């Protein structure tokens, strides 16, 4: 996944293209929506 950044969060997240939700199984704990993609934290 491409790197992405959410304001107020340390480090970087994974950018998932054209997704409205973060996929399970990666240990993501938070996310921010960047239409039409989503940024899932932590990387």
Curated annotation (Swiss-Prot):
Q: List the disulfide bonds.
A: 4-39, 6-32, 22-40
What sections of the sequence does the record tag as coiled-coil? none
Keyword terms, alphabetized:
Disulfide bond, Hypotensive agent, Ion channel impairing toxin, Nematocyst, Neurotoxin, Potassium channel impairing toxin, Secreted, Toxin, Voltage-gated potassium channel impairing toxin, Voltage-gated sodium channel impairing toxin
Q: What is the originating organism of this protein? A: Anemonia sulcata (Mediterranean snakelocks sea anemone)
Similarity annotation: Belongs to the sea anemone type 3 (BDS) potassium channel toxin family.
UniProt keyword Disulfide bond, yes or no: yes
Primary localization: secreted
User: Which GO biological process annotations does it have?
Assistant: regulation of blood pressure
Extra notes? Negative results: does not affect on Nav1.1/SCN1A and Nav1.6/SCN8A sodium channels. It has little or no functional effect on cardiac muscle, as well as on skeletal muscle myotubes, suggesting lack of functional interaction with Nav1.4/SCN4A or Nav1.5/SCN5A. This protein sequence is identical to BDS-1 from A.viridis (AC P0DMX6).
Where, per UniProt, does this protein localize? Answer: Secreted; Nematocyst
Molecular function (Gene Ontology), one example: sodium channel regulator activity
Q: Name one GO cellular component term.
A: extracellular region
Question: Which Pfam families does the annotation name?
Answer: Defensin_4 (PF07936)
Q: What does this protein do?
A: Acts as a gating modifier on both Kv and Nav ion channels, and also acts on blood pressure. Voltage-dependently inhibits voltage-gated potassium channels Kv3 (Kv3.1/KCNC1, Kv3.2/KCNC2 and Kv3.4/KCNC4) and slows inactivation of the voltage-gated sodium channel Nav1.7/SCN9A. Inhibits all Kv3.1, Kv3.2 and Kv3.4 by about 50% when tested at a voltage of +40 mV (45%, 48% and 56%, respectively). May act by binding residues in voltage-sensing domains S3b and S4 of Kv3.
Q: Name it.
A: Delta/kappa-actitoxin-Avd4a
- Which Gene3D superfamilies does the record cross-reference, listed alphabetically? Anthopleurin-A (2.20.20.10)
Q: InterPro entries attached here?
A: BDS_K_chnl_tox, Myo_ane_neurotoxin_sf
